[in-house]
Amino acid sequence: MSGQESRTLGAWGEALAAAWIRKQGGRIIAANFRCRFGEIDLICEEKGYLCFTEVKLRKSTAYGSAGAFVDFRKQNKLRATAQYYLSRHSTTFQPRFDVIEVYAPYGLETKFPKITRIENAF
């Protein structure tokens, strides 16, 4: 898969995750928030939480779950990016780190991708 195809598939997965969050009653505050520390795919408010969400799309679980790809190094980058965000955006919501797994065996051709959320993932 080329870099462009991978980015397209990733953006599609993030759009699916955002729609899923909205369907669950959440409100998207920011998408693809970037700073010098890293990037957070989705930031949303939901049930008293400010959720910093990493979206992982995989075609299969052959090499492990999608959530398993959020390793310690990535977690540290997400924490630093979230701290930066919170230093510039005050909130009364409790911060939380989630991972949304999107499984799409046929890539963009998948009609019913499986979406799951790991709340308080780390």
Range-by-range predicted roles:
Residues 27, 50, 94:
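Hydrophobic "anchor" residues on beta-strands that sit immediately upstream
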